[in-house]
């Protein structure tokens, strides 16, 4: 079965609202073996909606819409779908009573605008909406299926999970399962080169790399007639990829790098403190996102000036004068200084030139040093990046977390 997701709402086109519905529905459809061929976003305009429906059904069996089911005049999805399927809209008394009951919960009375929400194509299956006043519906005709859902995610998602998925599962006999591997320390092109044999020979499962800031994700996707069979197809490919990429894979699924690092620290009861210059607290902020980190994260210092590095971290004035603040020597003294000051097993530091100003020939914008102190041992890493200030700061935090992860292995 081929599907298109059609999200309706002028507010989406204007960028006032982020379209999370398409992402959610795509993932859910993939899990039950339905392939999504196209995403569309369209404003609240009946003629355009009709044209989009006609275009979509030229190559799809299934079109799922979200939005345009509200009580206002510009909510036209229901009317457009009814016209496309040549169906009259009729009042559904049960829905009318449910809408009225819902409105009473908010001390509101039924209006003609709300009454409009209780009209549906004559031949359709109505999907109750316990979270709002806009029921959805399913209409089938001439081998075409349209599933019409409300726009707000808190209304759409429960309806999709409880009503739409059971309906669709009866129509398909295949399952698609995916496994996501998260990779850092090497770029997308390096990943593609290392697993080129797998990428060139892929059929089922498929393997697709995706570049993100500071990391690459690999999605392994298998299609089979059962979940167990799909998983069994993924396992040998995943094993081979792990053998090739090794420690560059830091997690799978939704687990983020900071969560991996925080878990290691908590499980091994390793206390940590951070000393940041160019990242200005971003590194500490990432770590403290993790619940339970308070048992091991003792302190974070932002030491932006040379004076604060000397006074707060005990960085030697001579080191700063000889090597400058952007140097491996200062990064190491910062890491050791914060660890000893805070009394922690680990100290980690960042110093560099994030830009847009401050760069020199010897110390260009994007030159970064990460210092690391672990129970008396010191490590340092030099990085060179190009990009804007925010990118350089964010990538530095990612590399610092990964540097710590690898040295704790």
Curated annotation (Swiss-Prot):
One Pfam family here: MoCF_biosynth
Transmembrane domains' residue ranges = none
Q: Which InterPro entries match?
A: CinA (IPR050101), CinA-like_C (IPR036653), CinA_C (IPR008136), CinA_KH (IPR041424), Competence-induced_CinA (IPR008135), MoaB/Mog-like_dom_sf (IPR036425), MoaB/Mog_dom (IPR001453)
Which protein family is it in? Belongs to the CinA family.
NCBIfam families assigned:
cinA_nterm, molyb_syn, PncC_domain, PRK00549.1
* Classification via PANTHER family: NICOTINAMIDE-NUCLEOTIDE AMIDOHYDROLASE PNCC, NMN AMIDOHYDROLASE-LIKE PROTEIN YFAY
The identity of this protein, by name, is Putative competence-damage inducible protein
Q: Which organism is it from?
A: Clostridium botulinum (strain Kyoto / Type A2)
